[in-house]
UniProtKB/Swiss-Prot annotation:
InterPro entries noted in UniProt: KH_dom, KH_dom-like_a/b, KH_dom_type_2, KH_sf_prok-type, Ribosomal_S3_C_sf, Ribosomal_uS3_bac-typ, Ribosomal_uS3_C, Ribosomal_uS3_CS
Protein name as it appears in the record: Small ribosomal subunit protein uS3
Disulphide bridges, residue numbers: none
Lineage: Bacteria, Pseudomonadati, Pseudomonadota, Gammaproteobacteria, Enterobacterales
Primary gene name: rpsC
GO cellular component: cytosolic small ribosomal subunit
């Protein structure tokens, strides 16, 4: 039975970067990892209504820089920047080093896999029909310029006794193409019947910058080996 590799982990170092950017020795590695987990858990719990997509953590020599990607930056910043200052102080307490918090706005939340998954799960918790929620999210993503999108929900859909899995796809989602910019994320809907899992794949296009170019030493010209299939037609 075929299994699917994680689309983000497969493309790390090729077209995608890490969410935690730092280097640590063997002694400090576990402490840094635990600290990052606590910071992300606190941010997502504190900003549950701010539509937070991801949290990037960078550790410099003696301080930490946290970048929060959100579709509602006004909720994160607060009145005259009071909320973001409280957030910075709390993160500094968790990590034990001076913290810097940056806010990055997501212009098109319809093309962010995490926000799409959270939107569908919130609709399922409000007892919206799952097919209607999926089709609405697919139409919004394609309207905003997505090349393809796939959404999968699994669990006791519609309150039935036997759990099942359903998915809907529009456009193309090339999972094996490394240069394909595919966003993948998940979410959970806590309903009265149980937990319903939501998975979202969004294909935004291909990234060709930074790809490996093979060069011929004799000709000193870069080339890409492509097999041309010649077809002969008989009259």
């Amino acid at each position: 039975m075929g299994q699917k590799v994680h689309p983000n982990g497969m493309r790390l170092g090729i077209i995608k970067s890490w969410n935690s950017i730092w280097f640590a020795s063997k002694k400090e590695f576990s402490n840094y990892l635990d600290s990052d987990f606590k910071v992300r858990s606190y941010v997502k719990k504190k900003l549950i209504k701010a539509s937070v997509s991801k949290v990037i953590i960078e550790r410099l020599s003696k301080n930490i820089r946290v970048t929060i990607y959100t579709a509602r930056p006004g909720i994160v910043i607060g009145k005259k920047g009071e909320d973001v200052e409280k957030l910075r102080i709390e993160i500094a307490k968790i990590t034990g080093v001076p913290a810097q918090v940056n806010i990055s706005e997501i212009r098109k939340p319809e093309l962010d896999a995490k926000l799409v998954a959270d939107n569908i799960s919130s609709q399922l918790e409000r007892r919206v029909m799952f097919r209607r929620a999926i089709k609405r999210s697919v139409q919004n993503a394609m309207r905003q310029g997505a090349k393809g999108i796939k959404i999968e929900v699994s669990g006791r859909l519609g309150g039935v006794e036997i759990a099942r899995r359903e998915w809907y796809r529009e456009g193309r989602v090339p999972l094996h193409t490394l240069r394909a910019n595919i966003e993948y994320n998940t979410s959970e809907a806590h309903t009265t019947y149980g937990i319903i899992g939501v998975k979202v794949w969004i294909f935004k296009g291909e990234i060709l910058d930074g790809m490996l170019v093979v060069s011929n030493k004799k000709d000193k010209k870069p080339f890409i080996s492509v097999k041309k299939v010649s077809q002969k037609y008989r009259k």
